[in-house]
């Protein structure tokens, strides 16, 4: 079983920790794009890591995934509908929550036995490789707060 995701998740978690520790309150409120602030993007990461945490717990308990738990092809409606809830959380608390949930999911997926991880496929609602999603959005945040020359 390829467990390289553990190191990749760890790298992106360390990157997120470092970023969150140096972000000012002003930077947390900076816009990353038309819809999301820096804190909002961190909340978005926390939301999807939280979903993964739910599914990893279910896998750990050896409970089967159901068809209704499959992620839809287009998740824009989920992201758009979660944004007001994410934005209602204080920016600093949201940033700290993102780190905390990332720590929890990384620890849980790293602890899952190989035979459980091997049961996952492309249709599984759990992707133990949290690094890809995190890294994509951390890149966006870093670009948004980078001083313009």
Regions found by a protein language model. Name each.
Residues 1-25, 50-57, 132:
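Alpha-helical bundle segments that constitute or directly flank the non-heme di-iron/ferroxidase center
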Residues 16-19, 23, 59, 108, ...:
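A short secondary-structure junction motif
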Residues 31-76, 114-149:
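Short, contiguous alpha-helical
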Residues 2, 6-13, 91-98, 123, ...:
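Hydrophobic packing residues in well-ordered alpha-helices of helical domains and bundles
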Residues 12-19, 48, 101-104, 108, ...:
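Amphipathic, well-ordered alpha-helical segments in soluble domains
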